[in-house]
Structure formats: C-alpha cells, structure tokens
Amino acid sequence: MNSFEKKILILKKDDKDSFIALVKQLSTKEKQILFDTIDSRIRKLQTIYLNKPFNLKFLQTFIKEDSDEDDDDEEDEEDEEDSDEEEDDDVVEDDNTKDIGKSRDSDKSIKGKEKGKEKEKEEIEIIEQRYETKVIPKKPIYKDQQQELLQQLQLQQLQQKPISPIKDNSGVSYNTSFSSLSSLSMSNSTSSSLLSTSLLSASLLSASSSGLSTSSLSSSINNSSNNNSNISSSPLSSSPLTLSSSSSSSSPLQRIQSIQNLIRSNSLRTSLSSSSSLLPNLIQLQQQQLPPPPPSQQQQQQQQQQQQQNNSMLQQSNNNNISPRTQLLNNTTTLLPNNGLEEIFNDSNKIGEGGQCSIYKYMGTAMKRFKPSLSSSLISKEFENEVLILERLNHPNIVKIITYSTIERIILLEFIDGNSLDKYPSQSLPLSPSSSLPNPLKVIQDFQQIVDAMIYLHNEIGIIHFDLKPSNILKNSKNNKLKLIDFGISKFLNNNNQNNNNNSLNMGSYRYSPPELLCNNNQNNNLINKSVDVFSFGIMLWECLNWTLPYESLSREQVKQIKTDMERESHLPLDHLPKGIQDLIRLCWKHDPSIRPSFIEIRSRLSEIILNNIPSLNGRQFWISSSKYLQQNDDSLINNNNNNNQNNNNQNNNNNNNNNNNNNNNNKDETTSIIIYESIPWLKFKTFLSNHLNIYRQSSTSNSNSSFNLNNNSSRNNQRQQQQQNNRNRSVYNNNYNNNNNNIINNNNNNINNNRNRNYNAYYEYIFDYIRYILKVIDEKRDEVSVIEFSRFCTFFSPLISSSLFRSIQIFCDIPGLYGYCLKKDLILSSSMITLMSKIGYLIFIDPNNINQLFLKMKAPTSSSSNKNNNNNNNDNNNPSNFIDFTIRVKIGNYNQRIFQCHGHTSSSLSGLIKELQPLIDNNNSGNSSGSSSSKKSNSGFLYQKTPISEIKDRHINGSYLNQNYK
C-alpha cells in the first residue's frame, strides 16, 4: 500500500472536501502517479469512503492548473535568465544585433510555450481517453457535462470532421454506433427505471452530432419509454446494448475493465418495458438522423448480413414470444479476449470448482467461468441453457444472475457468503455435542426453503433441475437462507421431446439420479418428468440427516444396480429417523415415477411432521407437540368466530362429537391447509404458554393485598375449568389428531379469547418475562417471536425436546407446585425430593451461559403457617401470606457425582442440600414474620438474589412478581 492509499483510508466517509484538499496538496508528479495507478484497488478504496465510483473530472482540473502554474514559473525563470544574458550582450553588441537576438529569443520562447501546451493537451487527452471508458458513474450525466459534450461535437461538425472513435493506449477503438448488438445486456433481475450511463452518453453523442438538443433527446427517450405496446413482454430480459470493440486484440487493462463494466452495469439496468421500447427508437433515430461515414464494401456486406439476421430473429421472437437476446447469444461481438485475465482468474480468488466450471470472487460478485479445455460445443450449449433459464427465474431461494459474456463464457452471479450443504456439519451443530447426527428440526427448517424453490420451478416456470444435490445448494452464513444454483443441465417441461436425448439421460450425479436416468432406454424417455427432482430430493434429505455421502465407495454401475433392484435401504438405512421422515423419504424413492409425491405434497407432509410429535431413538424428540395453535383457519374466519366462541364455549364442547363426525362433509370450507408463520405475535405466544405450560399449578385464594390473587373467585374457577379443558384437548389432540382438527381449532380460539384479557398470577408473569427475555422480545416495538426464536425456546425449555435432559423434569411437572427449566445437564433427584415438593414449590433454572449454576425459585411456608398446617388441615396453606418466596443459587460441583453446593453446604442430591438449608430458610421466615430486616442483610448472599437475569431487569421491583414480603 503506497502513501496515497494510506491517505485515502484516513479520510472519513462522504468527506469530499477533505479529498479535494488532499489532492491539492499533492505535487504534479504525485498526481500523475495517481492517474497512472488508478485501478480496481484504488477505486474500491475511494468508493468505500465516498460511496460513489471514482470521478476524474475535478482531479484533471487540479493537474491542469498545477501544471500550468509550474510551467509559468519555469518560463519566468527562463525569461529572467535570458534577460540577464541579453543585458550583458547589449554592452558589446550594437543595436542591430540586439534586435536580431531579441526576435530570435522571442520566437524560441513562443515555440517552446506552444510545444509545452501541446504536450500537456496530448497527455490530458491520453489520460482522459484511457480512463474515461473505465469510469461508469452510478448517477446520470449532469447538465454541465452534457453541454461540454455538445460544444465539442458542434465544433467538430463546423470543422466537418467525423466523430472519431475513443481510443486507449493499446489502439482499441470503441464505436458509438448502435448498429452492433453485444452481449452486455440489461437483466430483468432488477426493476430500476434508470438507463446506464454508457447508454445515456452514447445517445447524447448520437443526438448532438445529428443536431438534436438535449431537451429533444430527453423528450424522445421519455416518449419511447411509453410506447412499448409492440415489444414482446417475454420473461427474458431486455435487448442487449453496449459499446462493441472493433478489434479482437486489446490490452489486459481493457479486458479487466470490460469485466468491471459488466459488474457495474447491474446497479443501473433498465426494466423490461423501458429498455425494450427504447432500443428500437434509438436505433431508428440513429439510422435516420445520424448517417454513418461511407463504409467499405466488406463492411457493407457484413452490415447487410447482420441486419438480415437481426430482422429474421426479431420476426421469430415476435412469433414465438422469445426475446432477441436469446437469439443473439452466438452472434455477439468480441467483448472479453481469451487471454490476459490472470489478475481475476487466479487461485487466490477461486471460491469453488466443479467438473465443467470454476467460480471466482471478484468485486463482490461470483464469477462463474466455464473451463476452456472442455468441448466448446457442449459447454456453449450448457452456458446458453443456464443463462436462458436464470434470466427467467426470480425467487428468494434461487441465485440471481447479474450479467454474462458469451465470448469468455462467463456468468456473473450474486455472491453468497456461505458454504454448500455438502459441508452441513460445519454449519449446523447437533442438539447434543456428543451426538454424531444433526438435529432433524434444523434440517427440516432448511429443507422447507428448498421445497419452496422447487415448487416455483415446477409449477410456475416449468423447469426440471436435473442436478439437485447438496453441493448445488448454498447456505448464507448471515441469514441462513438457502440458494439453489447450477442450472446448466436443467430442462423446460414443454421441450421434453427435444431435450431428452441420450446425452441428457446421462447428465447429473449418479448418486442422486433416479433409476430412469441411469438406464439408457428409449422407453424411459417418457418417464422423465418432475419426479426426477423428487427422487434427488429424497437422497439429499437422507444425506443431510445422516451427514454421510450416499453410496460412498461405490461405482456408478454398482449404484445403478442397487437402484434398479430397489435395494436402497440396505445401503441407506432409515430406521433411526423419525417415522414421518421415513415415510416421506420412501415415497420419494419409489421406483415408479408416477407414485412419487409432488413438491406441494412434500411441503404439506413437512408441515404435518412439524405439527406432530415425532419421537426418535435415544429418547430425543424434536419440535413441539403444543404448536397446534399454528394450525388455524383463515384470518377472516377467526375474526368472525371470536365473539361466537366467547359466548358458546359450553355449546362447542358439547358438540365435539358432532363436529368430529362431520369434519369431512359439513366443515370443508372452514378448514384450511396448515399454516406455518414466519413470526408469532407475542399475545398469541403468551396465550399458548398459559394454555400449554403448567407453571406453578397451586391455586391461590383471594387476597386483595397480595399480588398472587386473581380478580375474583369466578375467574379462578374459570381458570381451573379452562386448564382442565386444555388438558383434555391436549390428550384428544395427541390421540386423535387427524379426526379432531376442527375441534382443536375451535377450542384453541376459545382459549385465546378467554385468556386475552386475563390477569395472570405473579409466577405466570415471571415466567412470561423470563421467556420473553430469552427470546429477545423485550422491545415494545418488536412484538413478535420469529420461528428461529420459537425453535430456540422449544430447544431450551420444552420438556418434549431433550433426551435424558428432561426425564426428571417431566416427572416434576406432574407434581403441583413445580416447574423446571433445565437447559444443559441432566438432574436426577431422589424420592425424598418429591416428598418435599408437597410443601415447597420450585422453579428450577439452569443458566445457559454457566451450566454449573442452578437457580431455585422457591416458595416455602413460613414457620407460623407450617405450625397451623400441622394442627389444622384447612385451606390456609394456600394463602399467599403464609408463604415466602426467595431464590437460591446452587453450585453444581460435579455432574457425574452429583455434588451440589450452596452457602457452605454440600450434598450429593438436591433434596439433601435443601434439607440442610432448611434451618436457614426457617430462620429467614421467622425474621420476616417479625418484620426484622437484619435477617435480610445477614442472608443477602443466600436469599433474595436478583436472579435469574436480575429478576428480569428489575421490571417489577415493587413486588408484582412476588408477595409483599419480597422487596
């Protein structure tokens, strides 16, 4: 990095004044070096802090001013020296010799000045000619620049000089004519309404040379953009338009710059309607009002042939509704030579390589270059096929094309920062670090994106991918979005008869190809359809669920024999996978293509897998059994049924059997397909928690001064009835899911409406806020839970997720007064702990960041209340005033030996540790009952700790979480 680059990096972003001041400080030589060293690297640096491409206009003015000042100083010094010499000569020579000497010196000085100015002009012209073609600013040409161009061209017309093509130092000329069409076209991947600056500058040149003003040109452009009725509106991109090279040889600088122009053209490309309508008008305007210089006979013949080809292709495109760009793929002029691109195509920029192409990262794009060593005919067909298909596609899970070059066979694609799915283990960690298999939940989440992309290809565009495999799917490391790539051998469904030849049957990877592609029989040609991708999808799903290459160490013939004999499961076992996934993969592997499901059916099956409880081996269960609230009717039906559901709860419950019998007949219009939301409103999620998570199930008596009481006894009774109804609904849902969908939906809507305005007790609110903090939904502006956060909650908190992790917690949840959050390790508690649960309620937390600390949110009876309970068996034990709530931190010294430590006490079981801490609890209770505050201070390290998460950021510091004794 030179000194100039260091100075550029120091400047702040958008600080144009500082940049101009920096250039002014440079000497003339430094400025000249600046112009000589401006390449992609310095342009990148300048673009970073100015957020715009490099502009040489104002730099050229600085160089010109400084060079004039330096030359003036040198000339003044020479004049002074000459004057001194002349004075000395005047003493000796006579008047005649003096006059002769002065005239000669003046002539020399004038000639020297003229030569110096001519050299300066030549140098400036060389610099302008060399870099003017390189710079493509992202903003349109300003009025002052347009006036300068018009003035220059008017002077040339007055002198009757033809417009000379732009030349660089290598002698390559660039013609501004629109008669030749090249491969640099405007893709329809973006919908920008601006033309590229090269198009505007070329149109200005043609208009100004023909005598048109800038206003008339702009009006013609606007009028032409509206007259697009006669232009084909095919899904392909607009017609190509660029400046073509007049010779096949050019400098490496120009070749690199051509690729840079290809990349920059993406930000200023036109829409389909505007570009397609503007192109014929510009060509017509150029032909009518700007006649080219008289060409030679060879040029006339070439132009006539090219015009005939263009006319024939335009007629064919109008008849077949195909864009002219598709027909002109093989007839483009030389844009990028075949050699001298070592700066781009080197190993340091390579990010991927396949059998037929290599991918390089260059200027923020992915440059796909087909290998020149392969057969040109096959590669050209694959190249044209991929370009033709990519320009028709527009889906968030399919890679987007920027532009391409037919001569170099280069395709510029959007860059995706991530790896392919064949490197899946490095991107997705399993649920347990000791497990050798991935988390099926994560795999299914990712594969839903692939299914959406394939539904778009099959049903909306009509394309068969033919090469669906993990290496052709990229995963963005930033947003986890999947992108489908590599459409070189893809086919259109309506051209099966033309494309399904013997060569196409052998295409694709044999590990993922179906049997009908591996058998070269003419009878199988009719069987090649969309089911080819379904078979590959099943193999790919198995690979990502097992992290194992299918048919590893087997040859093509062996794999072919296995697939034709239908012995796949002997090599690709499925028994260890959840049953729903087993059935789906077996359907995708059917030998008969007509039996294989479509991707729409696959999507519905994946949704059912998500909504059902799917146990796997080793006690691991994934996803959520209680996520049935995601299955709902349309929003309009939900809104219309809200009021009815509130008033007709009993009626709906009594008519459950009738609804179950009439699901398929009477209620077809009310049921809809399964809907998986991208985000869940917090209100629905809170209702879901209250209905399905049994948090502290001991009921509280009415007490107006306690934060635990509900509004009244009736609301408490309704809550109990509602909870019992929810339990019955869950059992019905788990046992009769397919028969009770409508009943569950109605009851779930009832629960949402009944609980929407309900006041939860303090423990409910505490757990809600704790979960809300974990899900990072604290901000009031962000009142939704995303799917990723929802899955994180289920992975960390749901008792249905873990292996031995939640076995003991599942037992605890059946005991009133206990609910546990156990995140990382296994806790096995003794039977004495269960006995202790009848008197003490617990909320168990394990810190996700520190698994060696266990937090117990305890609710223990006070000493006075315990004496009353021993004497009288009444309902006073439910009075919150007789209980005290506190939190203790327990240190887990050794999980294997079950060593629990707290406040200097150690035990091999958690129940034993609590028994040892019971005297401290009793002393604290008695101190609180007497109103003493000394016990709080003495036990500050043991009780009343603001954890977990500092009591949810001290949100309810006034005691709304706990009873009045807690402060």
Swiss-Prot record:
Residues 95-122 have a biased composition (Basic and acidic residues). One of its GO terms (cellular component) is cytoplasm. Residues 65-122, 215-251, 287-326, 634-667, 700-752, 862-882 are annotated as: Disordered. Its EC number is 2.7.11.1. Gene3D superfamilies: Transferase(Phosphotransferase) domain 1 (1.10.510.10). SUPFAM superfamilies: Protein kinase-like (PK-like). It is an enzyme of class 2 (transferase). Residues 345-610 form the Protein kinase domain. This is Probable serine/threonine-protein kinase DDB_G0290621.
